[in-house]
Amino acid sequence: MLRAALKEHGMMDEIQVLSAGTYALSGATASTGAQRAMQRRGLSLADHRSRAVTGVLLETCSLIVGLTQSHINQLRMMYPDCPTPMIAFDDPPVSDPYGGDDAAYEQAACDIQRQLPALIQHL
C-alpha cells in the first residue's frame, strides 16, 4: 500500500520500501486474508515474501516505521544500538489481523490506508 501511495505521489524513485517482521519466518507468502484485502484495492501480494528483521537490515534503512508502538519498543530492545530513526504508525492504532478472518485483514488495511497521507507527508 505504501509503494502504491508513493507511486501516486511521484516518490517511488526517491524511496525504497522494505517489509520485515519481528517474528516473521523468511520466505513465506502473504496470508490469504492479506492477499484478498490488497486485491480489493487493485494491488497484488503475489511476489511478496516475508522477511525477519535483522540488525544489518535495520542499519541499511534511513527510517523504520512500525505498525504499533509495541513493535518499535520491541525493536529498540532487540537492537538498542540501532542508529536508525524509528516511528510508530499507530495514531490511531493499526489492528493486528494475524490469525483473523478476511474482515480482520480488511480492517487492518483500512487502518493503514487511513494513515498513509500522514506518513507520506512525514517522508
Give the ranges of each region predicted by the language model.
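Conserved active-site segments centered on acidic
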Residues: 1-59, 121-122
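Functionally constrained cores in energy, signaling, and assembly domains
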Residues: 22, 30, 35-37, 47-48, ...
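A short linear-motif detector with a strong N-terminal bias
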Residues: 42-45, 64-68
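Phosphate-binding/catalytic loops
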Residues: 63, 69-123
